[in-house]
């Protein structure tokens, strides 16, 4: 399975990695690589827990990420 991960610079240090398709699945790390490694482990644990509980595993649907520039008034 593949999931989109959003990486954001942390407020105080490092990076935060969020998985929009898996609500509440978030991790962090000092570097981007650390954050991605950690969130991969979080995704695996999240999916495993769903399967153990007999719950459906969310499947990501195709999405487009678009940046729009807007004028401030």
Predicted regions and their residues:
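Short, charged, surface-exposed hinge/linker loops at domain edges
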Residues: 1-3, 37-73
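Short aromatic-glycine-(Arg/Gly/Cys) micro-motifs in beta-strand/loop hairpins
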Residues: 7-22
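A short, exposed loop/beta-hairpin motif centered on an aromatic-Gly-Thr core
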Residues: 23-32
């Amino acid at each position: 399975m593949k999931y989109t991960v959003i990486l954001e610079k942390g407020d105080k240090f490092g990076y935060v990695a969020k998985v929009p398709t898996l609500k509440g699945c978030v991790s962090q790390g000092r570097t981007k690589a650390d954050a991605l490694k950690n969130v991969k482990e979080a995704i695996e644990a999240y999916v495993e827990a769903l399967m153990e509980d007999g719950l459906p595993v969310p499947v990501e649907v195709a999405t487009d990420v678009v940046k729009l520039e807007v004028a401030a008034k």
